[in-house]
Amino acid sequence: MTAPELRVDTFRAPEDAPKEPSAQQPRLPSSPSPAQALASYHHFPTNDQERWWEETGSLFSRFLEAGQYGLPQQYQFMFFFMHHLIPALGPYPQKWRSTISRSGLPIEFSLNFQKGSHRLLRIGFEPVSFLSGSSQDPFNRIPITDLLNRLSKLQLSNFDTPFFQHLLSKFQLSLSEVRQLQKQGSGPDAHPLKSQAAFGFDFNPDGAILVKGYVFPYLKAKAADVPVGTLIAEAVRTIDVERNQFTHAFGLINDYMQESTGYNEYTFLSCDFVETSEQRLKIYGAHTEVTWAKIAEMWTLGGRLIEEPEIIAGLARLKQIWSLLQIGEGSRAFKGGFDYDKSSATDQIASPIIWNYEIHPGSRFPVPKFYLPVHGENDLHVARALAQFWDSLGWPEHACAYPDTLQQLYPDQDISQTTRLQSWISYSYTAKRGVYMSVYYHSQSTYLWEED
C-alpha cells in the first residue's frame, strides 16, 4: 500500500494561524563580539589602557573576524591581547614613535593571504612604557626585557628564546653606550628611528600564538663606530659557528649588500622564537629608489640568483602586482620620519621600499620578500588591484571579498577617499608554496589624517 502523495501547493494555513515573522519585525539583539564580552567583565587599571583598548580592541576584533577564526580562538586571542599587549602600549596619547609603523604607532596589524588558505592575522609590536624616550630609558630598552620575561611565563607554542637573546646581546645598547651617545649629542631626538627591538605575533587557526623577534642594529653600530654591515656579519658568524646553517646563503646576501651599499640605518634582522635547528634568519633593508629596475636588482641579489628558476618565476609574478598597483616610480625623499597627522611634511608621506632575505637552515640561497609601499595611495584602488591580482592567480576566496573586507575593517571610513589604511603589500614566492602575500594596516580606530 502506497502513501498518499503530499502536494505542498494544496496546503493552506488556517486564517488564524500564527504568521512567520517578517523581515520588518524586530529581531533579537545579536551576540556581543569577543571584545565586547570580555570588556564587560574587565576593569582596566589605568586610563591609558582603557584609551588604548578603545583605539585598538574593536579593530582587533574585526581583524579576527576578517581572519575567519573560530569563536573559541577569537576569545583566546582577544584575552591575550587585552591582558598582555594593551598594558605594554604605554601612555595615551602616544609619546614614543616606534620604527615598526609609518605613523610611529607601536602596534601594526597584518593579514596574510595564500591560495585556499585561512587568512592569518599577525601583530607587529614594540612594547612601550612611561619611561620610553626619557632620560631614564632614552632608547626603550626596559620594556623589551619586561615583555620578554612576561612571555616566558606563558605556555606559548614552541617558545624558545636563546637565539633572540643572542641577537639582543649583539645589537642592544649597553648602559654605558647609551650614556656615550648622549654625551656625543646623539640623544633620542638625534635620529627619528630609535627603536632597538620589537616582537611579532602570529595567530594560528589552531589557537597557537607564535612569536618572532626583531632587532635594529643601527644605534649599536653608531655607538661602536663600526659599519652596520660589519656588525651584522660578525653577529651572524658567531651565532652560526657551530651549526653552519646560514653561512652560504648569508654570504650571498652580504656580498650584494656590501657592493650595493645596501646596509644603512634602516637595516634590521628578525628570527623566530624556536629551537635553533628550526630557526629562520631574515635580513631586512630599505631603499628610497622605488623603481622596477632596482626591485629586479634586489630580487636577484644583483644577478647572483638569475639562474634560479624559482627566483625568475617569482619576479614575473611580482611584476604583475607592481603594474596593477601603479606605484609612482622614482627616488623618494624619505628621511626616516613619521607620518602621523594631516600636517606631516610632504617628504614623510611617501615610503621607501622594504625587502627581506629569508634564510632557512642549510638553504643554497635566500628567499626574497618585498614590501611594496602603498601608504599614501588610494585605499580602494589598492584593494581593487589586489583583488584583480588574486583573481589572476585563481584565488576567488580572497579576490571576491577583499574590497568589502577592507571597508568592514574600517566602517567609519570611506575607503574610496582614504589613503593610509593600507601601508605595505608584502610579496614572496617559492616553487613549493607559490605566491605568499600580506597586507599591513593602520592599526588604531582613529584615522589620524582626517580633514576638519
Curated annotation (Swiss-Prot):
The keyword Calcium does not apply. Addition of 5 mM Mg(2+), Ca(2+) or Mn(2+) slightly enhances catalysis (about 100-120%). Significant reduction of enzyme activity (2%-35%) is observed with Cu(2+), Zn(2+), Fe(2+), or Sn(2+) (5 mM). GO terms for biological process: alkaloid metabolic process. It catalyses: brevianamide F + dimethylallyl diphosphate = deoxybrevianamide E + diphosphate. Its EC number is 2.5.1.109. Residues 21-38 have a biased composition (Low complexity). Keywords: Alkaloid metabolism, Prenyltransferase, Transferase. Notoamides have been shown to exhibit antitumoral activities. Notoamides A-C show moderate cytotoxicity against HeLa and L1210 cells with IC(50) values in the range of 22-52 mg/ml, but the IC(50) value of notoamide D is greater than 100 mg/ml. Moreover, notoamide C induces G2/M-cell cycle arrest at a concentration of 6.3 mg/ml. The record marks 124 as: Required for regioselectivity. Brevianamide F binds at residue 108. Deoxybrevianamide E synthase; part of the gene cluster that mediates the biosynthesis of notoamide, a fungal indole alkaloid that belongs to a family of natural products containing a characteristic bicyclo[2.2.2]diazaoctane core. The first step of notoamide biosynthesis involves coupling of L-proline and L-tryptophan by the bimodular NRPS notE, to produce cyclo-L-tryptophan-L-proline called brevianamide F. Monomer. This is Deoxybrevianamide E synthase notF.
